[in-house]
C-alpha cells in the first residue's frame, strides 16, 4: 500500500486545486524554494492522517484556509488516494470498495464544519484511525511523518524524553489507562466493604430488638384467629338468611314478569300497528300534499287555459266568417263592375271595327291622291325646269353633258333609295320578330300570373300552412302537458329528497360523526375522481338483504362492519383514503374484494349429529355472488340458535359464533354478550333499507324527470322545426306572390314595349311608302332625261310639251280637289278612332286590368284559404272542446281523489288516536307492573348489597384453619356469640401497640444480613482479582518496554554502523536506583512485580528513569561519548539512526521526511540517501531536501512553485531537479 495521489484545494498556500499524481511506491523527493509551500504539503498530509489537527477551534480552522487576494475561499480540503492492491485496509461498514484497488480519504474543513469522507461516503475520524491501524499505520508511532524541527527536537532530547518516546512506541498509555481503572475499582471495592461491615453491625442490633416484638405478635395472632372464627360464624348465619329472602323475592319477580308477558305481547302488536298506521298516514299526507300542490293546481290551470283557448278559437272563427262574407260581397261587386266595363270595351271595339275599314280605305285613297298629285307636280316642275335649263345651253352636246350628269345623280339616288329600302325592310322584319317575342312573353306572363300552376302552388302552400299550424298547435299542447308533468315530478322529487335526507340522518345517528362524514365524502370523491361504480360498490349493509326474522341477528353480528365500504382492490381503497386524508373528510374502513379469500375451514356441524337445532346466518342473507367474500367474511362463521347455552357449546366446539333471535351471542372463546334490545328502535339495517328504498324511488323519479326533460327538449326541437317549416312555406308563398307582382310589372312593361314597337312599325311603313314615291319620281325623271337625249336640241319647249304643261296644270287642280275631299273625310274618321282608343287605353282597359288584378289577388285561392282556415278552426274548436271536457273531468277526478285522501287521512288519524289510547292504557298497566317490579328489585338490591357486604367481610376474614371449623356453634345463639366477640375485642384492644409486621420485619432484616454477608464475600474475591490484574498489567508494561527497547537498540546499532561504518553506538536504558555512572553497560531489565507493588494500589513507583545514547564516530574500540558531547551534525546522525530504528520496530507502508538531511555533513547525507533507497524497497518514502544526494537515488521528483502567493506542484525529472537545487542553493554540494 502506498500514497498514489494527493489533491489539495484551499489549504494554506494551495488556493487552487493542486493534484500531485503518480507518486512512486518507493522513493519520492519534493524540492522547492524556501517558503514555496513544501512544509504546507507535508502539513496537508498530516492534516488528514495524524492527530496534530484534531479538535480545531474556529480560529485554527480559519488559519488552515487559504488567505490571499482574489475571491474568498470558504473551505479547505485535502484528499489522499492510496493504492491498496492487497486490500490491507479494512473499510468500515457501509463504505463500498471502488473496485480499482484505490482507497480515497478526504478531509474538508470550513469555518463551521470538519468532515471526513472515505470513498465519497461520510465517516468519522475514528473510522479513519481504525482503518489506518489495520494497514499498519499507528498513531502511537510519532515518526511515520517527520516534519521540520522533529530531528532537532530529538537531537536535543533528554533521557527522560527518549524514554517517553520508547513508551509511546510500546503503547504504554493503554497500559496506564487500564492500570488506573483497576486501581480506581480497587478503591471502590474497599469503600464498599467498609460500608457493608457497618451495616452488618446495625442489623445485628436491630434483630435482637425484633425478637421481643415477635413474641407479642404471636399472642395477638392467636386472639385474632378466635375473633375471626366468631365473626365468620355470625356472618355466615346472616348470609344464609339473606339468600333465603332473595330466593323468595326472585319467585315474586318471576310471577310478576310472567303475568306481564301477555300485556307486552299486546303492546308489541299495538306498536306494529301504530307504526304501520303512521307510515300509511305519512304516505297519505305526502300524496295529499302532491295532489294539492301539483295535480289540483295543474288541473285548474289546464281547465283555465283550455277555456281561454276555446274563447280565442270562437273569436277567430267569427273573424274568418266575417272576412269570407265581406270578400264574397266585394268579389260580386267587382265582378259586376268588370262585366259592365268589358261590355263597354266590347262596344267600343265593335265601333272601332266598323270604322277601321273606311279609315284604311280613306288612308289608301289619300296616299294614292298624294302620289298622283306629287307625280303631276313633279312632271310640271320638270317641264318648267326643262324650259329654263335648256335655255342655258347653246348646243346639244352641252345639253347632253348636263343630262348625263343628272342621269348619274338620279341613278345614284335610286340606288341609295333601294339600299335604304333594304335596310328598312330588315328593320321591319326585326321589329316584327321583337313584336312576336313580346307577344309570347306577354302570354307567358299572363299564364304565370293567372295560370293553373301558380294557383295550384298557392293552394298547396295554403294547405301545407294549415297542416303545419295544426301540427304546431298539437306540439304546443304536448309541451304544456310535459311542463305540467315536469312540475309534478319536481314536486315529488323534492318530497323524496326530503325523505332521502331524513333517512340519511337516521343512518348517521347509528354511527359516529367521523364515519358518517367519511361515507358521504367517499361518494363525493368517487364522483370527483370519476371512479367507476364497478370499483366502489357501497357499504356492506346496502349490498345485502336480510329476512326480517333474522334482522336482529345480522344487526348484532355486523355491528359497524355494516358500514364498511366494499371496493374491488386495495389500490382503489388507497386512492380514496389518500384523498380523505388530504381533505380531512372523516374515517372509513374498506373491504377490498381482491384481498379476501373464502375460508375453507368453516364447516357447520350437522343438525342430526349435534341434536341441536341451528341455522347458518349466511343462508338467511341475500346478496350478489360477486360480494360473497365480503359477506362471508362478516357473517360466514355465525349460526342462529334457540338457546344460548346450547349455542355456546357449538361455538366452542366448532370455533363458530352463536346468536339467538333476540340478539344474545356467544363467541368461540366462550364470551357471552346480550341483554335487552329495543325491537322498535330504528336499527341500522332498517335505516339502510329505508335509505336505499328512498334513494331508489328518488333515482326512479329523477330518471322519469330526465326522460320528461329529454322529451321537452325533443318537443322544443320539433316546435322549432315546425316553426321553421311554417316560416319557410310562408316565405315561399310570399316569394310566389312577389313573383306575381313582378310578373304584372313586367307585363305592363311589355305592353308598353309592344305599343312602342307598333309605332315604330307604322313609322317604317310610312318611310317605305315615301321611299317608293321618291323612287318612282326619280325613275320617271330618269326616263324623261333619257328620252330627252334622244330629242334634238331646242331651247324652247315643243308644242306637245307646252300642251302637256297646260294639261298638267288642270290635272293638278283636279288632284288637289280630290285630295282635299279625301283628307277631310279621313280627318273626321281619325278623330273618332283617336277618341275611342283614348277612352279604351286611358280609362276602360286600365279599369279592367285593375279589377282583374284585384279579383286575382282576392281570388278563389284566397277565399278557399279562408274557408280552409275556417274548417281548421272548427276542427280545432272540436278538439279544444274535447280537451275542455277532459280537463273538467280531470279536475273533478283530482278533487274527488283529494276528498278521498282527506277522508282516508281522517280515518287513519282516528285509528291512530284509538291505538294510542289503547297503547297508553297498556303502558299504564305495564307501569303498575314496573312499579311492583321496581319495589321487588329495590328490596332485592338491598339484599344483594347486604349479601355482598357479608361476602366481602367473610373474604376479609380470610382463610381459616381446618380445625377452626370443627365446632359449628349450633348450641350457641347469635347473641351469645356476639357477647364473646365483644369480650375478645376488648382483650385485643389492650394489645393495640403490637407491631403487626414483626414477623415480616424480622424475616426481612435476617435476609438482609445474609445478603450483606454474601456481598462481603464477593467483594473479597473481586479485590483479589483486581490485585492480580494490577500485577499483570505492570508486568506486561515492563515486558513490552524491555522487548521494544531490545529491538530498537539492535536496530539503532545496525543503522548507525550503516551510516558511520567506522563508528559504533548503543542505547542505554536507566532503571531506578541504578548508579548514574553505569552507562557503559547494557542493562538487562528484570522486574520483580511483588517488590514493586505499592500497598495502597497506586502506581507511584517508576521502573525506568530514561534512555541515553553512547556513540563513537572514529573507532569501535575508543571510549564512547554521550550524545550531549557531540557536534550538531553528529547529533543529527544519531537522531536519524534512532528514528529509523524505531520505524523498523513498527514498520509502516509509507513515511514522510521533511528536510531530515538539512544539518548533515556531506558523507552522512550520502549514507542516509543510500539507506533510504534500500528501505524504500519495502515502503514508500516522500522526502523534501535542499541537497542533491537524495536526488541521485530517488525515483520520482516534484517541484513546489510559489507564484502570486499561491503554491503549485509539478513533476520534474532528475536533471531538472538537480539543476534547480544547484541553481538555487550554493551549498547543495557542500
Swiss-Prot record:
Residues 172-482, 685-1041 form a coiled coil. One of its GO terms (molecular function) is double-stranded DNA binding. It holds the Pfam family SMC_N. ATP binds at residues 32-39. Acetylation at Lys-112 and Lys-113 by ECO1 is important for genome stability and S phase sister chromatid cohesion. It is found in: Nucleus; Chromosome. Residues 1078-1097 are annotated as: Disordered. One of its GO terms (cellular component) is nucleus. Residues 535-651 form the SMC hinge domain. SUPFAM superfamilies: P-loop containing nucleoside triphosphate hydrolases, Smc hinge domain. The modification N6-acetyllysine is found at residues 112-113. Its main location: nucleus. Keywords: Acetylation, ATP-binding, Cell cycle, Cell division, Chromosome, Coiled coil, Mitosis, Nucleotide-binding, Nucleus. One of its GO terms (biological process) is reciprocal meiotic recombination. InterPro entries: P-loop_NTPase, RecF/RecN/SMC_N, SMC, SMC3_ABC_euk, SMC_hinge, SMC_hinge_sf. It comes from the Eukaryota. Present with 2660 molecules/cell in log phase SD medium. Belongs to the SMC family. SMC3 subfamily. PANTHER family: STRUCTURAL MAINTENANCE OF CHROMOSOMES PROTEIN 3. Cohesin complexes are composed of the SMC1 and SMC3 heterodimer attached via their SMC hinge domain, MCD1/SCC1 which link them, and IRR1/SCC3, which interacts with MCD1. The cohesin complex also interacts with SCC2, which is required for its association with chromosomes. Involved in chromosome cohesion during cell cycle and in DNA repair. Central component of cohesin complex. The cohesin complex is required for the cohesion of sister chromatids after DNA replication. The cohesin complex apparently forms a large proteinaceous ring within which sister chromatids can be trapped. At anaphase, the complex is cleaved and dissociates from chromatin, allowing sister chromatids to segregate. The flexible SMC hinge domain, which separates the large intramolecular coiled coil regions, allows the heterotypic interaction with the corresponding domain of SMC1, forming a V-shaped heterodimer. The two heads of the heterodimer are then connected by different ends of the cleavable MCD1 protein, forming a ring structure. This is Structural maintenance of chromosomes protein 3. It comes from Saccharomyces cerevisiae (strain ATCC 204508 / S288c). The lineage of its organism: Eukaryota, Fungi, Dikarya, Ascomycota, Saccharomycotina.
Amino acid at each position: 500500500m502506498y500514497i498514489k495521489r494527493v489533491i489539495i484545494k484551499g489549504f494554506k498556500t494551495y488556493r487552487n486545486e493542486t493534484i500531485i499524481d503518480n507518486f512512486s511506491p518507493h522513493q519520492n523527493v519534493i524540492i522547492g524554494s524556501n517558503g514555496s509551500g513544501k512544509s504546507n504539503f507535508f502539513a496537508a498530509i498530516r492534516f488528514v492522517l495524524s492527530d496534530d489537527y484534531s479538535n480545531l477551534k474556529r480560529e485554527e480552522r480559519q488559519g488552515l484556509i487559504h488567505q490571499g487576494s482574489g475571491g474568498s475561499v470558504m473551505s479547505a480540503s485535502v484528499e489522499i488516494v492510496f493504492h491498496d492492491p492487497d486490500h490491507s485496509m479494512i473499510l468500515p461498514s457501509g463504505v463500498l470498495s471502488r473496485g480499482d484497488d484505490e482507497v480515497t480519504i478526504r478531509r474538508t474543513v470550513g469555518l463551521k464544519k470538519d468532515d471526513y469522507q472515505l470513498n465519497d461516503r461520510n465517516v468519522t475520524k475514528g473510522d479513519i484511525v481504525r482503518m489506518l491501524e489495520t494497514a499498519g499505520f499507528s498513531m502511537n508511532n510519532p515518526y511515520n511523518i517527520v516534519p521540520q524541527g522533529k530531528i532537532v527536537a530529538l537531537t536535543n532530547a533528554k533521557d527522560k524524553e527518549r524514554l517517553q518516546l520508547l513508551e509511546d512506541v510500546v503503547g504504554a498509555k493503554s497500559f496506564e489507562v487500564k492500570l488506573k481503572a483497576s486501581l480506581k475499582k480497587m478503591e471502590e471495592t474497599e469503600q464498599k466493604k467498609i460500608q457493608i461491615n457497618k451495616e452488618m453491625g446495625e442489623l445485628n442490633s436491630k434483630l435482637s430488638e425484633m425478637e421481643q416484638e415477635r413474641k407479642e405478635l404471636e399472642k395477638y395472632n392467636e386472639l385474632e384467629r378466635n375473633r375471626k372464627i366468631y365473626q365468620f360464624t355470625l356472618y355466615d348465619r346472616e348470609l344464609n338468611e339473606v339468600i333465603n329472602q332473595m330466593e323468595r323475592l326472585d319467585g315474586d319477580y318471576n310471577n310478576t314478569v310472567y303475568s306481564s308477558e301477555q300485556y307486552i305481547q299486546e303492546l308489541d302488536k299495538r306498536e306494529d300497528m301504530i307504526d304501520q298506521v303512521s307510515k300509511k298516514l305519512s304516505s297519505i299526507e305526502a300524496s295529499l300534499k302532491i295532489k294539492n300542490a301539483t295535480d289540483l293546481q295543474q288541473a285548474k290551470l289546464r281547465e283555465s287555459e283550455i277555456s281561454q283557448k276555446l274563447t280565442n278559437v270562437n273569436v277567430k272563427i267569427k273573424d274568418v266568417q266575417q272576412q269570407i262574407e265581406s270578400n264574397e260581397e266585394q268579389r260580386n261587386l267587382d265582378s259586376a263592375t268588370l262585366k259592365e266595363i268589358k261590355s263597354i270595351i266590347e262596344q267600343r271595339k265593335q265601333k272601332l271595327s266598323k270604322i277601321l275599314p273606311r279609315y284604311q280605305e280613306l288612308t289608301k285613297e289619300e296616299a294614292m291622291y298624294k302620289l298622283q298629285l306629287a307625280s303631276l307636280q313633279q312632271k310640271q316642275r320638270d317641264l318648267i325646269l326643262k324650259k329654263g335649263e335648256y335655255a342655258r345651253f347653246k348646243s346639244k352636246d352641252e345639253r347632253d353633258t348636263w343630262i348625263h350628269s343628272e342621269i348619274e345623280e338620279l341613278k345614284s339616288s335610286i340606288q341609295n333609295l333601294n339600299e335604304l329600302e333594304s335596310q328598312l325592310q330588315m328593320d321591319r322584319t326585326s321589329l316584327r320578330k321583337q313584336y312576336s317575342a313580346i307577344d309570347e312573353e306577354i302570354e307567358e306572363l299572363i299564364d304565370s300570373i293567372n295560370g293553373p300552376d301558380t294557383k295550384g302552388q298557392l293552394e298547396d302552400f295554403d294547405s301545407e300552412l294549415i297542416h303545419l299550424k295544426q301540427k304546431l298547435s298539437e306540439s304546443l299542447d304536448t309541451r304544456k302537458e310535459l311542463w305540467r308533468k315536469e312540475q309534478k315530478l319536481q314536486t315529488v322529487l323534492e318530497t323524496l329528497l326530503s325523505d332521502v335526507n331524513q333517512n340519511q340522518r337516521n343512518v348517521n345517528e347509528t354511527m359516529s360523526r367521523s364515519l358518517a362524514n367519511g361515507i358521504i365524502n367517499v361518494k363525493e370523491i368517487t364522483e370527483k375522481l370519476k371512479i367507476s361504480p364497478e370499483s366502489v360498490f357501497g357499504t356492506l349493509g346496502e349490498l345485502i338483504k336480510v329476512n326480517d326474522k333474522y334482522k336482529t341477528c345480522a344487526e348484532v353480528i355486523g355491528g359497524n362492519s355494516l358500514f364498511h365500504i366494499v371496493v374491488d382492490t386495495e389500490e382503489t381503497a388507497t386512492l380514496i383514503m389518500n384523498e380523505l386524508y388530504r381533505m380531512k373528510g372523516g374515517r372509513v374502513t374498506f373491504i377490498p374484494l381482491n384481498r379476501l379469500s373464502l375460508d375453507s375451514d368453516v364447516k357447520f356441524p350437522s343438525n342430526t349429529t349435534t341434536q341441536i337445532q341451528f341455522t347458518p346466518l349466511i343462508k338467511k342473507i341475500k346478496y350478489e355472488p360477486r360480494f360473497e367474500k365480503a359477506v362471508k367474511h362478516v357473517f360466514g362463521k355465525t349460526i342462529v340458535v334457540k338457546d344460548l347455552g346450547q349455542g355456546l357449546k357449538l361455538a366452542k366446539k366448532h370455533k363458530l359464533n352463536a346468536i339467538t333471535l333476540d340478539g344474545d351471542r356467544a363467541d368461540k372463546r366462550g364470551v357471552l354478550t346480550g341483554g335487552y334490545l329495543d325491537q322498535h328502535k330504528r336499527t341500522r339495517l332498517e335505516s339502510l333499507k329505508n335509505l336505499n328504498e328512498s334513494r331508489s324511488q328518488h333515482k326512479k323519479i329523477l330518471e322519469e324527470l330526465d326522460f320528461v326533460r329529454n322529451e321537452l327538449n325533443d318537443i322544443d326541437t320539433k316546435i322549432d322545426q315546425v316553426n321553421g317549416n311554417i316560416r319557410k312555406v310562408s316565405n315561399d308563398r310570399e316569394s310566389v306572390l312577389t313573383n306575381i307582382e313582378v310578373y304584372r310589372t313586367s307585363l305592363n312593361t311589355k305592353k308598353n314595349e309592344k305599343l312602342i314597337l307598333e309605332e315604330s312599325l307604322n313609322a317604317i311603313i310610312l318611310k317605305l311608302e315615301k321611299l317608293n314615291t321618291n323612287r318612282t319620281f326619280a325613275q320617271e325623271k330618269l326616263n324623261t332625261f333619257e328620252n330627252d337625249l334622244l330629242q334634238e336640241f331646242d331651247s324652247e319647249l315643243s308644242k306637245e310639251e307646252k300642251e302637256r304643261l297646260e294639261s298638267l296644270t288642270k290635272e293638278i287642280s283636279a288632284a288637289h280637289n280630290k285630295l282635299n275631299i279625301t283628307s277631310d273625310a279621313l280627318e273626321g274618321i281619325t278623330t273618332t278612332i283617336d277618341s275611342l282608343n283614348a277612352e279604351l287605353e286611358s280609362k276602360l282597359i286600365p279599369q279592367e286590368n285593375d279589377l282583374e288584378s284585384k279579383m286575382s289577388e282576392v281570388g278563389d285561392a284566397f277565399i278557399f284559404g279562408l274557408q280552409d282556415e275556417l274548417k281548421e278552426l272548427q276542427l280545432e274548436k272540436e278538439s279544444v272542446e274535447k280537451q275542455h271536457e277532459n280537463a273538467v273531468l280531470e279536475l273533478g277526478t283530482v278533487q274527488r281523489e283529494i276528498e278521498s285522501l282527506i277522508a282516508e287521512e281522517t280515518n287513519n288519524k282516528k285509528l291512530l288516536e284509538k291505538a294510542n289510547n289503547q297503547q297508553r292504557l297498556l303502558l299504564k298497566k305495564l307501569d303498575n307492573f314496573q312499579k311492583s317490579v321496581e319495589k321487588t328489585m329495590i328490596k332485592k338490591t338491598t339484599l344483594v348489597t347486604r349479601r355482598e357486604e357479608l361476602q366481602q367481610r367473610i373474604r376479609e376474614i380470610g382463610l381459616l384453619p381446618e380445625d377452626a371449623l370443627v365446632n359449628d356453634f349450633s348450641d350457641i345463639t347469635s347473641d351469645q356469640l356476639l357477647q364473646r366477640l365483644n369480650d375478645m375485642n376488648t382483650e385485643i384492644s389492650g394489645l393495640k401497640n403490637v407491631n403487626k409486621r414483626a414477623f415480616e420485619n424480622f424475616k426481612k432484616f435476617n435476609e438482609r444480613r445474609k445478603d450483606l454477608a454474601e456481598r462481603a464475600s464477593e467483594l473479597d474475591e473481586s479485590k483479589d482479582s483486581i490485585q492480580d490484574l494490577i500485577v499483570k498489567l505492570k508486568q506486561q508494561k515492563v515486558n513490552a518496554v524491555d522487548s521494544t527497547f531490545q529491538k530498537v537498540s539492535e536496530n539503532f546499532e545496525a543503522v548507525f554502523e550503516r551510516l558511520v561504518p567506522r563508528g559504533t553506538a548503543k542505547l542505554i536504558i536507566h532503571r531506578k536506583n541504578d548508579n548514574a555512572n553505569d552507562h557503559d553497560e547494557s542493562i538487562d531489565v528484570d522486574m520483580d512485580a511483588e517488590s514493586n507493588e505499592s500497598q495502597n494500589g497506586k502506581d507511584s513507583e517508576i521502573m525506568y528513569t530514561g534512555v541515553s545514547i553512547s556513540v563513537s564516530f572514529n573507532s569501535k574500540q575508543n571510549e564512547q561519548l554521550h550524545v550531549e558531547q557531540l557536534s550538531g551534525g553528529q547529533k543529527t546522525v544519531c537522531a536519524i539512526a534512532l528514528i529509523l530504528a524505531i520505524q523498523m520496530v513498527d514498520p509502516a507502508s509509507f513515511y514522510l521526511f521533511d528536510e531530515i538531511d538539512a544539518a548533515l555533513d556531506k558523507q552522512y547525507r550520502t549514507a542516509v540517501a543510500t539507506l533510504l533507497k534500500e528501505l524504500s524497497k519495502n515502503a514508500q518514502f516522500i522526502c523534501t531536501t535542499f541537497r542533491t544526494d537524495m536526488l541521485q537515488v530517488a525515483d520520482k521528483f516534484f517541484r513546489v512553485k510559489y507564484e502570486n502567493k499561491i503554491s503549485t506542484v509539478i513533476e520534474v525529472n532528475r536533471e531538472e531537479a538537480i539543476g534547480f537545487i544547484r541553481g538555487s542553493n550554493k551549498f547543495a554540494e557542500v
